[in-house]
Amino acid sequence: MQRRHSLKAHAAVAALAGLSALPAHAQDTIKVGILHSLSGTMAISETVLKDTVLMAIDEINAKGGVLGKKLEPVVVDIASNWPLAAEKAKQLVSQDKVAVTFGCWTSSCRKSVLPVYEEANSLLYYPVQYEGEELSKNVFYTGAAPNQQAI
């Protein structure tokens, strides 16, 4: 239960942080990118993450959205293919104009999309632990790094 509330809070913060990337004219929705493998070898792990983000978006929208605007999920399948992940990330940021993206399950995926988010000055929420020693103002690393874990 606490994890679900944490995810909802992160989604709201991410959506709010991404509002500055929106055009000045009024919009009815705030687009949220979901960048996960829904096919291929990683689908077994990442499909659940996609479902969790969709559930959080539904709950936020049921309570009035963010600043009165509904969140609109834009789901893409990166098919467990890291070069494809970079292409899909670019599509989310450039064509779909998402305010924020939740995605990737592996460090290989994160490293392949990182240049896209940094170049576009867009925001990626990375949901799992990682090896550390990487810092980007465009990524929220929500999982622990090795120096944050106790044996």
Model-identified regions with their sequence ranges:
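Extracytoplasmic "Venus flytrap"
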Residues: 33-52, 76-83, 105-108
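Sec/Tat signal peptide C-region and signal peptidase I cleavage site
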Residues: 22-26
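Bacterial N-terminal signal peptides
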Residues: 10-21
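N-terminal secretory signal peptides and thylakoid transit peptides that target proteins
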Residues: 1-12
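Signal peptide-proximal N-terminal region
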Residues: 51-73
